Design a protein with these regions (language model features):
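Ligand-binding pockets and gating/stacking loops
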Residues: 2-512
Length: 512
């Protein structure tokens, strides 16, 4: 493969590129600009993209990785004890803790305890307000996965277990709607959620741009700003021009002047880098305030125009990774930097929140020690983030003509990884759980068929059962894997062009 024809480096080209980049690896996070200019309409169509892609009117995907296994029967498909013939031995709840929502198939769990496993913090959560507020734009699809390994299950929740040549949902969205975006696919996830797909035919711009620290990352999006005593821009431009001229005349430059890797590197360094700097992303994406301890103005920097609002919505943005990721995700979409962003908790403890712990060890996987408390705490964390993002996106106009908000063109996919085992010691209210293939996923968007559960739950086993992805018809007893259906459902709801993909018809996901 060559970079020119596929947007991908061959092994030999990669080795050459690495040697070229050795002195400038700090540029990598923001030098992966769009490669679509190298693609012909025919090659784009072969990649599964329409020739008349909606370049001027993008749609957006937010993936939230619920690391550790977010149990759907501890949230929207919870089972009451009175409904099950095996209530004492399974993960069923006292009837009063499972609240119904008028004219909705969803349920909401209310939970209270004085501690979270062995962690001495109270857990008091109630999902009812969230469900009431968002039910009309919520869809829950039951699922059976194919792995209970964290990393593998996380990645398969993004690829549908290789449903479309191994590409991830984020990559498919970047290909479809990311043309012209500086960084179409930004990934702040962890583990398998952060992995790229295996479709090597995609342009490089479709693959995720990793971001480790969302609060500090924007400060690296300019080669000279923020450096005390840095030369003015015209001097830097002159130095860069001189450097490029010398490189071109060097023995190395003349020897490898026809190398596609060197041509690409020169384009990144000489064309894409100045373009990215001209976008002023170092300001637009910067949530940090100008304080004595963070003297932005001293170094010629300033906070984003949206900074104060985001710091109010996400007060823990600097110490709580999820809040910081959510703040950056909103800005990446608002300023049309990206069409796909990925975020979510990792397995590390985060200090903060009203009780001192923002993220418990192992995130949802703390359910090994305290299933009910862990699920309640982490679902509250996820749903709070989702609610804040939706509120921000609803208030943000998409454009001046259509009357649409950003939310009208956005889909949030909560990738739950896998489920949890259902048995418990007879009548126990505190117990641990293991990993289980059986679960469900949550989608939220004006584009999905809202107020809908695809599939259902058998109350006597508390296992979910499947559905027909085309018609939405429930199929009790169906417990076979349906990962491609979920993958196709997300893209179908968004209106992606799936011609040539071989994906199943998932019309049941889409609002009509």
């Amino acid at each position: 493969m060559t970079l020119k024809t596929t947007g991908r480096l061959s092994r030999r080209e990669l080795l050459r590129a690495l040697s070229l980049c050795a002195a400038g690896t700090s540029l990598a996070p923001f030098l992966s600009g769009c490669r679509d200019s190298r693609q012909t309409p025919e090659s784009l169509e072969k990649l599964g993209r329409k020739r008349d892609a909606l370049d001027g009117k993008p749609k957006f995907l937010i993936v939230i990785g619920a690391a550790g296994g977010a149990s759907i029967v501890d949230s929207f498909l919870a089972v009451r004890q009175s409904e099950s013939a095996n209530a004492a031995a399974l993960n069923t709840f006292p009837d009063a803790q499972v609240q119904g929502v008028a004219d909705s198939p969803f349920r909401a769990v209310k939970y209270s305890n004085t501690r979270l496993g062995s962690i001495n913090i109270p857990v008091n959560t109630d999902q009812l307000a969230f469900v009431k507020k968002h039910a009309s734009e919520m869809l829950v699809a039951t699922s059976v996965g194919t792995s209970v390994n964290h990393g593998i299950a996380q990645k398969r929740s993004l690829t549908g277990n290789g449903a479309w040549r191994g590409r991830t949902l984020q990559e498919a969205v970047a290909l479809q709607w990311g043309s012209g975006m500086p960084l179409p696919n930004v990934n702040m996830g962890t583990g398998g959620y952060a992995e790229r797909g295996t479709d090597d035919s995609l342009p490089l711009s479709c693959f995720g741009e990793p971001v480790v620290n969302p609060s500090l990352w924007p400060l690296g999006l300019d080669g000279s700003r923020g450096i005390a005593g840095a030369p003015p821009k015209d001097v830097i431009a002159l130095a860069r021009s001189t450097r490029d001229a010398l490189d071109q005349k060097s023995i190395f430059g003349r020897t490898f002047q026809d190398s596609s890797a060197l041509k690409r590197w020169n384009e990144q360094r000489g064309v894409q880098q100045p373009k990215l700097e001209a976008l002023d992303l170092i300001t637009k994406l910067n949530v940090l305030p100008d304080l004595p301890s963070i003297p932005l103005s001293k170094y010629g920097l300033e906070s984003s125009a949206d900074g104060a609002r985001l710091r109010e919505v996400f007060p823990g943005f600097f110490t709580d990774p999820v809040q910081g990721q959510a703040a950056l995700a909103f800005l990446l979409l608002k300023y049309r930097v990206s069409v796909s962003v990925t975020l979510g908790p990792d397995f590390n403890v985060a200090v903060g929140g009203p009780n001192g712990i923002a993220n418990p060890p192992l995130a949802f996987d703390i359910s090994h020690n305290d299933h009910r408390g862990g699920q309640a705490f982490m679902w509250a964390r996820i749903l709070s983030t989702v609610d804040s993002l939706i509120t921000l996106l609803k208030a943000e106009p998409f454009d001046a003509d259509s009357g649409e908000s950003m939310w009208d063109r956005t889909l949030i996919y909560v990738a739950t990884e896998f489920g949890r085992t259902r048995p418990r010691p007879s009548g126990a209210t505190e117990f641990g759980s293991g990993h289980d293939l059986n679960n469900g996923f949550l989608l939220l968007s004006p584009m999905v068929k809202g107020n809908t559960v695809l599939g259902g739950v058998d109350p006597n086993t508390t296992l979910t059962y499947g559905f027909d992805a085309r018609t939405g018809e429930r199929q009790p007893g169906k417990v076979t894997s349906n990962e491609p259906d979920i993958f196709s459902g997300v893209l179908t709801a968004m209106g992606a062009d799936l011609s040539g993909s071989g994906l199943p018809d998932a019309s049941a996901f889409k609002r009509t």
